[in-house]
């Protein structure tokens, strides 16, 4: 079974920041930057090109809303929104998802060399999760 399906269905733990009947968003286990969030459709689609057209508006609305919240909650200067389609493009988990990656002006080009990613502490995930959830209440 897909790791993202397991998180969506509650079989695996994820630091969920947003959820509705079509979409779930949770913190990336191996963040590129603090606040790196993944937005996934509840239904399993291998990649964005396979998503049912009736799901796309819900997904895009969630990506926008969560991006606003992440940017505000983490006081980021910018946001990168990306999705990889296929192994050659860097897709690792074959459940369609969007990466919301906050950026700051003083940071180097974090995407240029894909800085090494590592799992963070439980305290990190809980702090960021709470900040994003609280910010979403005002969006």
From Swiss-Prot:
<dbReference type="InterPro" id="IPR001310">
    <property type="entry name" value="Histidine_triad_HIT"/>
</dbReference>
<dbReference type="GO" id="GO:0009150">
    <property type="term" value="P:purine ribonucleotide metabolic process"/>
</dbReference>
<feature type="domain" description="HIT">
    <location>
        <begin position="3"/>
        <end position="110"/>
    </location>
</feature>
<dbReference type="GO" id="GO:0006790">
    <property type="term" value="P:sulfur compound metabolic process"/>
</dbReference>
<feature type="short sequence motif" description="Histidine triad motif">
    <location>
        <begin position="95"/>
        <end position="99"/>
    </location>
</feature>
<protein>
    <recommendedName>
        <fullName>Uncharacterized HIT-like protein SSO2163</fullName>
    </recommendedName>
</protein>
<dbReference type="InterPro" id="IPR019808">
    <property type="entry name" value="Histidine_triad_CS"/>
</dbReference>
<dbReference type="Pfam" id="PF01230">
    <property type="entry name" value="HIT"/>
</dbReference>
<dbReference type="InterPro" id="IPR039384">
    <property type="entry name" value="HINT"/>
</dbReference>
<dbReference type="InterPro" id="IPR036265">
    <property type="entry name" value="HIT-like_sf"/>
</dbReference>
<dbReference type="GO" id="GO:0047627">
    <property type="term" value="F:adenylylsulfatase activity"/>
</dbReference>
<dbReference type="InterPro" id="IPR011146">
    <property type="entry name" value="HIT-like"/>
</dbReference>
């Amino acid at each position: 079974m897909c790791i993202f399906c397991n998180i969506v269905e509650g079989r695996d733990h994820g630091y969920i920041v947003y959820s509705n009947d079509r979409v779930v968003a949770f913190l990336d286990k191996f963040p590129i930057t603090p606040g790196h969030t993944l937005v996934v459709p509840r239904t399993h689609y291998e990649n964005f090109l396979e998503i049912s057209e009736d799901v796309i508006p819900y997904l895009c609305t969630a990506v926008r809303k969560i991006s606003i919240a992440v940017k505000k909650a983490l006081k980021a200067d910018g946001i990168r929104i990306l999705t990889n389609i296929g192994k050659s493009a860097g897709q690792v988990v074959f459940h369609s998802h969007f990466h919301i990656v906050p950026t700051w002006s003083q940071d180097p080009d974090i995407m240029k060399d894909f800085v090494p990613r590592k799992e963070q502490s439980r305290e990190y995930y809980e702090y960021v999760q709470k900040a994003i959830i609280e910010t979403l209440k005002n969006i």
